[in-house]
Design a protein with these regions (language model features):
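Short active-site neighborhood of thiol/selenol oxidoreductases, capturing the structured segment around
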Residues: 51-74
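N-terminal "domain-start" segment that seeds a small globular fold
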Residues: 23-53
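Structural microenvironment flanking redox-active thiols in thiol-disulfide oxidoreductases
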Residues: 74-114, 124-131
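C-terminal motif of bacterial Sec signal peptides marking the signal peptidase cleavage site
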Residues: 17-19
Length: 177
């Protein structure tokens, strides 16, 4: 076989192998998947209000996992505020920040620094985060939950295309009355 033909076949085989691997959706550090019921939770926000998976049934909502030390979270939160919360809150969307195991003072500082107005809750010991993710998973995540309490969309990090897809998913869920 000529060297050019062998090289072409090698490149083709490698391309096919890489294509197959990338066509499978990785878990990206999640224990849960789209279609699964959201784990049961009871959270308290910085204003002392209680939020629960049971109490939110019948609503479309987002659980936004965050932490004060997370740079990507700090970048994403103003986008959630402007492009999601302001746009959909009057349509019935609930957006809950879920801070990973930090004291209220640190969380309040994060809220003040990022300017968000949606409720941000404490997750003592990272209990809910541990139900949703594998051990040592990164923090920046959003889980969109449908009216039946099932996970409808998951994000990881702040990727513009994925963020736009999440907005579309929220819009669709809110339209489905």
């Amino acid at each position: 076989m000529r060297p050019a033909a062998a090289l072409s076949l090698s490149v083709l085989a490698l391309s096919m192998l890489c294509g197959c691997a990338s066509s499978q959706e990785p878990d990206r550090g999640y224990r849960v998947a789209v279609g699964d019921p959201v784990p049961e939770f009871n959270l308290t926000d910085l204003d002392g209000r209680t939020w629960s998976s049971e109490g939110l049934k019948g609503s479309v909502y987002i659980l936004q996992f965050t932490a004060s030390w997370c740079g990507v979270c700090r970048k994403e939160m103003p986008h959630l505020e402007e492009r999601v919360w302001h746009r959909f809150k009057d349509d019935g969307l609930q957006l809950l920040g879920v801070d990973l195991d930090e004291p209220a003072a640190k969380i309040q500082s994060l809220v003040d620094d990022t300017g968000v107005t949606y409720p941000v809750c404490l997750d003592p010991g990272g209990a809910l985060f541990a139900e949703v993710t594998v051990p040592k998973a990164g923090v920046t995540r959003n889980g969109v939950v449908d009216r039946e309490g099932n996970i409808a969309f998951l994000t990881r990090l702040f990727d513009e295309a994925e963020f736009e897809a999440m907005i579309t998913a929220v819009d669709t869920l809110l339209e489905d009355q």
